[in-house]
């Protein structure tokens, strides 16, 4: 079992070529805007960069990147589950340049199958959160951290929310608890794996979720529908990603968020296709550098202000948005993505067969 901590953990990202070093120099975080010069952007041949992303600010980011670099981006915005299905289905003939989703476990699984470019680390100043999160092979890059799961409730209807995970199993909350489907929602598998890690293993975690189902657990595809079930009165307690939960509170002052002990750290990350052309890999590296530049961080923190913008930064000099609680006030745990990532398919299959259905 991974020790429980009150510090956070993310990861890194994938492989460099000599051409990438030239491109990155023009988009270094040491610049005031994070944008490359027109001369450096024209130094390498441009091809469309295909971005698979489940981030709420991805449209704003890809537009800003294209404006800064002149590189055309084709964005496939979808939930994490369908994006991973596309990648695995086409792994012998891939059609993606980079993947940007929440959950390092997904990237560890891709890395262990040889699908990610290794060895690239952007030229940035990591804070302790970022430094702790870099995988040894540099096969993916952390871009931020959220928490999974936050407990969201209507404080006008629930005076005393559960204080522990075990209290969710009590008759008081029969039919009142909702969460997401891990086959659709990327943040949900790390939550399930985190509970298994906390409780002492897969079988004990399966027993916990089986008891939740017996107690009337309600499953919806993703954060949005789960929160809608809460606000409509179908459920009383929603277990969702912290960014979605805090965003919901910003929009509805009757809602509140609690963090049960412990919550699992959920890094967002970018990984590059190991089989992409060298030109597209170089552009993907420039994209990572742009995301982590001052200009890119402004886009991340403004592109989805009641959703994914509510993250904990991994860079020095970048502060989380004011709506977020101090991370030191929350008891968190880290899970090893290389332990849990390879089990994602098996655990999700079990969950869908035994809990969702």
What residue ranges belong to the model's regions?
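Mature extracytoplasmic/periplasmic domains
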Residues: 273-334
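Short, polar/charged alpha-helical segment
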Residues: 50-74, 248
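Secretory targeting and sorting signals
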Residues: 1-31
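A ligand-binding cleft/hinge motif common to bilobed small-molecule-binding domains
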Residues: 105-109, 231, 236-254, 304-305
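A bilobed periplasmic-binding-protein/Venus flytrap-type ligand-binding module shared by bacterial periplasmic
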Residues: 150-157, 193-196, 267-280, 299-303
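Bacterial lipoprotein signal-peptidase II cleavage site
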Residues: 27-41
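Periplasmic-binding protein-like
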Residues: 147, 207-212, 251-274
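Extracytoplasmic ligand-binding site segments that recognize negatively charged/polar headgroups
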Residues: 47-57, 78-82, 94-234
């Amino acid at each position: 079992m991974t020790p429980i901590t009150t510090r956070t953990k993310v990861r890194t990202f994938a492989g460099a070529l000599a051409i990438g070093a030239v491109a990155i120099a023009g988009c270094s975080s040491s610049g005031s805007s994070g944008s490359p010069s027109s001369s450096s952007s024209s130094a390498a041949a441009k091809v469309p960069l295909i971005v698979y992303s489940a981030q709420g600010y991805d449209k704003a980011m890809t537009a800003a990147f294209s404006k800064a670099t002149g590189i055309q981006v084709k964005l496939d915005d979808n939930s994490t589950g369908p994006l991973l299905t596309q990648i695995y289905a086409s792994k012998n003939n891939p059609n993606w340049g980079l993947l940007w989703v929440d959950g390092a476990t997904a990237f560890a699984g891709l890395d262990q199958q040889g699908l990610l470019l290794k060895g690239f680390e952007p030229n940035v100043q990591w804070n302790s959160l970022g430094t702790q999160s870099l995988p040894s092979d540099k096969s993916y890059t952390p871009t931020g951290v959220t928490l999974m799961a936050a407990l969201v409730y209507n404080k006008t209807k629930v005076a005393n929310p559960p204080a522990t995970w075990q209290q969710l199993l009590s008759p008081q909350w029969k039919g009142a608890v909702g969460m997401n489907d891990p086959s659709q929602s990327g943040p949900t598998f790390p939550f399930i794996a985190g509970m298994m890690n906390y409780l002492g293993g897969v079988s004990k975690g399966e027993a916990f979720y089986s008891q939740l189902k017996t107690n009337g657990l309600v499953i919806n595809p993703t954060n949005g529908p789960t929160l809608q079930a809460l606000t409509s009165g179908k459920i009383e307690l929603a277990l969702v990603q912290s960014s979605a939960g805090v965003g919901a509170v910003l929009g509805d002052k009757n809602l509140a968020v609690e963090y049960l002990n412990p919550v699992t750290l959920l890094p967002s990350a970018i990984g590059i296709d190991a089989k992409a052309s060298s030109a597209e890999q170089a552009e993907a590296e420039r994209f990572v550098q742009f995301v982590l530049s001052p200009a890119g961080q402004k886009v991340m923190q403004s592109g989805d202000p009641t959703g994914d913008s509510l993250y904990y930064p991994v860079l020095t000099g970048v502060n989380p948005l004011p709506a977020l609680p101090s991370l030191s006030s929350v008891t968190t745990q880290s899970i090893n993505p290389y332990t849990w990532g390879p089990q994602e398919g098996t655990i999700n299959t079990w969950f869908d067969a035994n809990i969702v259905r």
